[in-house]
Amino acid sequence: MMKPDLNSPLPQSPQLQAFGSRSSDLATEDLFLKKLEAISQTAPNETVKNEFLNKEIPSINKLFTRFLKNRKKVIDWDKINPPPADMVLNYKDLPAITEQRTSELASKLAVLKLNGGLGTTMGCTGPKSVIEVRSEKTFLDLSVQQIKEMNERYNIKVPLVLMNSFNTHQETGKIIQKYKYSDVKIHSFNQSRFPRILKDNLMPVPDKLFGSDSEWYPPGHGDVFFALQNSGLLETLINEGKEYLFISNVDNLGAVVDFNILEAMDKNKVEYIMEVTNKTRADVKGGTLIQYEGKAKLLEIAQVPSSKVEEFKSIKKFKIFNTNNIWVNLKAMDRILKQNLLDDMDIIINPKVADGKNIIQLEIAAGAAIEFFNNARGVNVPRSRFLPVKSTSDLFIVQSNLYSLEKGVLVMNKNRPFTTVPLVKLGDNFKKVSDYQARIKGIPDILELDQLTVSGDITFGPNMVLKGTVIIVANHGSRIDIPEGSEFENKVVSGNLHCGAL
């Protein structure tokens, strides 16, 4: 199919004109739009072409135009304040909910898991949600089991909603067939697919709608509001009598439904709740909840002026961070979407190198929506509600005796003398799940572990015990094989050691 002349005017169709206010860089904006329209001409059929023209192009162009308008705009640091006491509820102060009230609220709830990520950072192919994390169960298995247990206990039907990306949608559709007899209703939808943008000239990277997947990206989990509306599921959930949606990352094993939080939301007519928790040294880069011009606002490190980054990382000033566990009133979401208020969500500019090209991705975060909802609040929750598995170091912790699995929920071992989780850093030799499994013959007893650092060519024997601070380093070209039953407490191990040497 011939490509249109990029210098010719665009068709005067409503879907290509209704993009709202223009930026000052009209030439760039117009050329970007023409490039998108040219991409649409490569669609395999009219249905796909019209879908891209009517839904994707307006969304892409709206985000790009706002980026052009605001790219030189910086946050006014002097207007940033810690959230006042009444903006962040303390979880410990929330009244306990009765069993009858729990059943009432559960009937109004839907649960959404953000399922767009791949397992590539852990050396796996396909959706990250199918990695086995505990007792041969995957992230998705645990999510389904939790909802199944809740539905049976309260005799209700809370649905599970999965927001996939173009990277995970097709395979997820096949995987969820295994749950068709589980009595858990699963809705699955695909979030948007935006073109990566060349950093030097701000033009789309792809020239075909279905060329290389590496030329496209999902525009962040903030797309959940728009994608839920575009899929028709927002309307479906409201029509089914659902009033509340609990959103979380599928890899956060601590993000289970908590009816004390939902009761506080319902009782106080709160439209949006962001769960936050106290920062540790490991969380200094996490987004934080602030008060800005009298409103609740999410502040991400990418928005912070370079001169203020160290201040942002300070635990003294910014004591909490966003867990990305979010509770939303569905009717309020529907209202603000129809009012186009979320079109002003903050844009995160994510620079990358892809296929040797310097590119940028324009992304939005689900937490950035907080400032557009009425009576929005944070809830400072226990650390146990933030248990993400981003690496094999995290996998090491959740597979250990630090936790047990009860009805799909990870519960910390009562014999752990501290409430904190140990800091574990496994080196590059453990980065892939396959290498991690080959090198660790059995997860050690870590009930009394504070910190573990492992670097180099190392293998763990079964039935080990680690306590306090343990550092194990194999020098370059050397190897350490730790024998079965070894016990280390506040110990540094280095050099070149083999089985039986310790």
UniProtKB/Swiss-Prot annotation:
A GO CC term attached to the entry: cytoplasm
Keyword Transferase: yes
Residues involved in substrate binding: G116, G117, H221, N249, V250, D251
GO molecular function, one term: UTP:glucose-1-phosphate uridylyltransferase activity
Species of the source: Dictyostelium discoideum
Lineage, opening ranks: Eukaryota, Amoebozoa, Evosea, Eumycetozoa, Dictyostelia
CDD domains: UGPase_euk (cd00897)
Residues covered by region (Disordered): 1-20
Function in brief: Plays a central role as a glucosyl donor in cellular metabolic pathways.
Record has Cell inner membrane as a keyword: no
Enzyme Commission code(s) on record: 2.7.7.9
Catalytic activity: alpha-D-glucose 1-phosphate + UTP + H(+) = UDP-alpha-D-glucose + diphosphate
Keywords: Nucleotidyltransferase, Transferase
InterPro entries: Nucleotide-diphossugar_trans, UDPGP_fam, UDPGP_trans
Protein's name according to its UniProt entry: UTP--glucose-1-phosphate uridylyltransferase 2
